[in-house]
Structures are given as C-alpha cells and as structure tokens.
Amino acid sequence: MGNYRIAVLPGDGIGKEVTSGAVEVLKAVGIRFGHEFTFEYGLIGGAAIDEAGTPLPEETVRLCRESDAVLLGAVGGPKWDDNPPHLRPEKGLLAIRKQLDLYANLRPVVCYDSLVSRSPLKPDLVQGVDFVIVRELTGGIYFGQPSAVVENGEEKAVDTLLYKKEEIERIVRMAFELARGRRKKVTSVDKANVLSSSRLWREVAEEVANEFPDVTLEHMLVDMRMQLIRAPKQFDVIVTENMFGDILSDEASMLSGSLGMLPSASLSASGPSLYEPVHGSAPDIAGMNKANPIAAILSAAMMLRLSFGLTAEAGGRARVWQALALGSGSRLGQRRPHLSTNEMVEEIKAAVLDYTAIAQIMTVYA
C-alpha cells in the first residue's frame, strides 16, 4: 500500500490524450493493488506559451519538485515554429530537465515478435532486438552558450559543447549498472577522433569500466549509427552524450516497427524523475481519438518500477498491454484501424482490474 503524488504535464498535440489514458490505467492499478495515486496538472511547451507566456512556468517547476514523479505527454507543433528561440515549446523540455537535474534518459528498444512485420528492416535483422540507449541529458551542446553575431555584415552562429568529468562519470556508471543486470555489455559512443569532449568521454568510460570487471566495454564512433541498421542485435546498453543520444535514439526507435509503442524515462539524481513516450505531439491527429496511448502507458509502467519500486505492478501491467495490444490483435491503428484511443485504454484498464486476466497473461508472458 502506498500514496504517490504524480505531476502530469500533458503538453501539446496528442499529449493530453495519451497522458489521460496513462492516468486512467494508473487509477486501475491503484484500485487493483491498493495504492493511492494523486494527479496534479501543469503546463509545459506550446500550451504554456499560449496561457502563461513562457514554455515552462515557475508553477510547473514547483509542482514537479513537490511530486514523487512526473508524467509528460509531448511538446511542440507548427503553431509555434516562427516564435523566437526563447519562446519555442522545446525550450520547456530542456528547462525542466535542467531544473530537475534529469541527467539520464533511458530508451528501451525492443522489437516484439508481433511487430516484426511492421519494421522497415528485414525480419531476421530485427527479431529479438532488445537494447537500451542511455543518453546524457543535462550537458553537451544543447546546454552550451550559443551566440549569434554579425561581423562586417556576415552572420555567424556559435554553439559550445562542454562536458565536465563528473557529468560523464555518473552517466557512464549508470550504463554499467544497467548492463550488469542485462547481458553485460556497454557500447560507449563518441567522436574521439575529432572532439576533445569525446576524448575525455572515452577516458572516463575506461576508468569506470575498471569498477565493473564482469561487464564488457567497447567504443564506437558516432559514425556507427549504420550499425543500428546493419546489425542491431549486437547491442545491449548504448551510452552516449546528449546530441548523439538524441539522434541515435530517434533512429533506433524505428527498429521496433511502431514509434507509438516506445516509452522513456529521464532520471534525476536527487529529485523526481520524468517519464514520457518517445513519440512527438502529432498535431495532425490531436483531438481525433486516434492517438496510440501504449507508449505513455508503458512510460507510466517504468515510473511504477523505477520511481516507486512497484515491480509486480509494473511487470504485470506490461504483460497486460502486450497480451491486449500484441497477442489479441488489438494494435491501435494497425490491426484494428477503428480501435480508438479510449477503447484501447478501456481494454487495458479492464484487464488490470480483472485478477483472472492478469494471472492468465502473466502465465503466458512470464
């Protein structure tokens, strides 16, 4: 039995719909397992710009800091594309990462058997793919000091890529700890043949590796992104800096066959962590009850496990959605194109509340 306070930041586009679905399933988990979840809502992204004049209001930061975890929908949309840089929705996401010290982003990449046919790659390449990308979130070029100047009539722009040793050390150590519970292999991705920051990254990775003699470390240049397509099953845990991780994780997300199935977690060293689906705001289908809620629901499942330590609840729920969304042929917008967001959520809620269904599902998927 537990009481947990969750800050919900729907954001833009389909963010409201998918977070609403995740909240409904969390309520079902609370009923089924005897937990109490309190949900409080805040603004971020374009919605915050429209209502509060800033992509991240102070009220939202305060709400998040006072909560046990944060559930985010999505930010962005063409409506704000012409805004000045400080009034872009994405600035809200960068700011909340910094404010909460969300230093590590975990993106599981799994291709389930039922989704193999949806992948753009050949089945023999993606069947059995199961790795995690660990991306550093609070350092690097996204948080450097950019500047734009005009000298002698010529426009110039500068972005600074800066990493401290301790920033690298803590993210690499997390990757090794994660790998120790998996297949015991870490692939560190850098650009050490060109960048000084990457040479430091590689040196620190070697130092941390000495603490984990049971885990294998390999280095790859970021040029290795072709390996994600050529031989994705070789990877277990990939760890990399902010910008490289941004690019690699988006590319890797397509291996699964559906962007709408992938969750992510952004972990804090000392405060609440944030959970969000990998997909974007999809403004073209916003409000149409067509959005796939599974990535948001799985993100909430990661919250149960990583922030609250509710392993049984998270694991059981993951099996519920797998059985419904994959095994029974209920994949939203794929096998049953007329299955709405709300219908998918209701199916998963019903299975969570039905003890018999959970027992059967866990037997099949254990």
From Swiss-Prot:
Pathway the protein takes part in: Amino-acid biosynthesis; L-leucine biosynthesis; L-leucine from 3-methyl-2-oxobutanoate: step 3/4
Signal peptide coordinates: none
Sites where the protein binds Mg(2+): 223, 246, 250
Cofactor note: Binds 1 Mg(2+) or Mn(2+) ion per subunit.
InterPro entries: IsoCit/isopropylmalate_DH_CS, IsoPropMal-DH-like_dom, Isopropylmalate_DH
Site (Important for catalysis): 142, 191
Residues reported in the UniProt entry to bind substrate: 97, 107, 135, 223
Chain residues that bind NAD(+): 77-90, 280-292
Ribonucleoprotein as UniProt keyword: no
Keyword Oxidoreductase set for record: yes
EC identifiers of the protein: 1.1.1.85
Cell location: Cytoplasm
Cofactor: Mg(2+); Mn(2+)
SMART domains recorded: Iso_dh
PANTHER family for this protein: 3-ISOPROPYLMALATE DEHYDROGENASE
Protein task: Catalyzes the oxidation of 3-carboxy-2-hydroxy-4-methylpentanoate (3-isopropylmalate) to 3-carboxy-4-methyl-2-oxopentanoate. The product decarboxylates to 4-methyl-2 oxopentanoate.
Family the UniProt entry places it in: Belongs to the isocitrate and isopropylmalate dehydrogenases family. LeuB type 1 subfamily.
Protein name (record): 3-isopropylmalate dehydrogenase
Organism: Bacillus caldotenax
Gene: leuB
